[in-house]
Swiss-Prot record:
Catalytic activity: RNA(n) + a ribonucleoside 5'-triphosphate = RNA(n+1) + diphosphate
Protein name: DNA-directed RNA polymerase subunit alpha
Domain notes: The N-terminal domain is essential for RNAP assembly and basal transcription, whereas the C-terminal domain is involved in interaction with transcriptional regulators and with upstream promoter elements.
InterPro entries: DNA-dir_RNA_pol_insert, DNA-dir_RNA_pol_RpoA/D/Rpb3, DNA-dir_RpoA, RBP11-like, RNAP_asu_C, RNApol_insert_sf
Gene from which the chain derives: rpoA
Organism from which the protein derives: Mesoplasma florum (strain ATCC 33453 / NBRC 100688 / NCTC 11704 / L1) (Acholeplasma florum)
Length: 317
């Protein structure tokens, strides 16, 4: 069985806080950029676990359409503010779906922010400046938020069915996904071979409760664990190497141009053009090589003959 090229994967751009990342994987055979990109995108959006509030309890409020004396916002507005809360709940301390309580009680006039919440061990609020409500003169806010780790999106109706929900709680919609945006695309690349290759470009942005690189790694592991089930369908399958080690051709492409036995004039022209390896040489079109400053017809012929002798080709226009 013909081996696939083993791609390299890396970060090409990252925000200072690492909540945004741009990643590339190459070389991939034609069609694999879309196959892998779509699978990663769907898994990132639907299956990345995170933390969210699923219910609240406010003293003096029985439902979300209540107004509270001394509080500027009604319960509906408080719920909308709570939905913006970004949490991180330590999965090493709390099991999946284990409820944690975040509390605040105050009669101090002014805004009540997420940083005012009293948190149990292993729980962190990332957007502490978020205003949850404003207390007016004579008002008192006694608020409990119920949160947990999970996946996906749950409506307030679905959350009403949870065993932890008791009378007095107001359930809300909960979005557990920490992923804000995922985009992917592909671009063709030239390796100096007749076969078509492409590059996967993946962009991921999170809410800060998980790093973009960690989210991509986790999504990959989720996919691998599911695909692994299908490898057991046949008990007797000949072991084949799908991803081979670096081939002789690949190693040859990384050879410095100094080792290609060019004349000194041709070598100097290539070096001045920023071409240091055979890979960089064949990634250029023939027109680009011809346009290299001070490269004469004799040197051009020498370079073309060398590339042809190695059974490689220049990038197509």
């Amino acid at each position: 069985m013909k081996q696939f090229n083993k791609p390299e994967f890396g970060i090409v751009k990252e925000s200072p806080n690492k909540f945004y990342g741009k990643f590339e994987a190459a070389p991939l055979e034609r069609g694999f950029a879309v196959t892998l990109g779509n699978a990663l995108r769907r898994t990132l959006l639907s299956s990345t676990p995170g933390a969210s509030v699923f219910a609240i309890k406010i003293a003096g409020a029985q439902h979300e359409f209540t107004s509270i004396s001394g509080i500027e916002e009604n319960v509906t507005r408080i719920v909308l503010n709570v939905k913006k809360l970004i949490l991180r709940i330590d999965s090493a301390i709390y099991n999946d779906d284990e409820t944690v309580e975040l509390k605040v009680g105050t009669s101090t006039i002014g805004p009540v922010t997420a940083g005012s919440l009293v948190l149990p061990a292993g729980v962190e609020v990332l957007n502490k400046d978020l205003v949850i409500a404003n207390v007016a003169e004579g008002g008192n806010l006694d608020l409990v938020l119920y949160a947990k780790n999970s996946r996906g999106y749950k409506t307030f109706k679905e959350n009403k069915e949870l065993k932890d929900v008791v009378p007095g709680m107001i359930t809300i919609d909960s979005n557990y996904s920490p992923i804000i945006k995922v985009a992917y695309g592909s671009t063709p690349i030239n390796l100096g071979k007749a076969q078509d290759f492409e590059k996967l470009i993946l962009e991921v942005e999170t809410d800060g409760s998980i790093l973009a690189s960690d989210a991509v790694s986790l999504a990959s592991k989720i996919l691998i664990s599911h695909f692994d089930v299908f490898t057991t369908l046949a008990e007797e399958v000949e072991e084949v190497a799908i991803m081979g080690v670096e081939t002789v051709e690949e190693k040859e492409l990384d050879k410095p141009v100094e080792e290609l036995e060019f004349t000194q004039r041709s070598l100097n022209c290539l070096k001045r053009a920023g071409i240091s390896t055979l890979r960089e040489l064949v990634s250029k079109t023939e027109d680009e090589i011809q346009d290299i400053r001070n490269l004469g017809r004799k040197s051009l012929k020498e370079i073309k003959d060398k590339v042809a002798a190695l059974e490689l080709t220049f990038k197509q226009n």
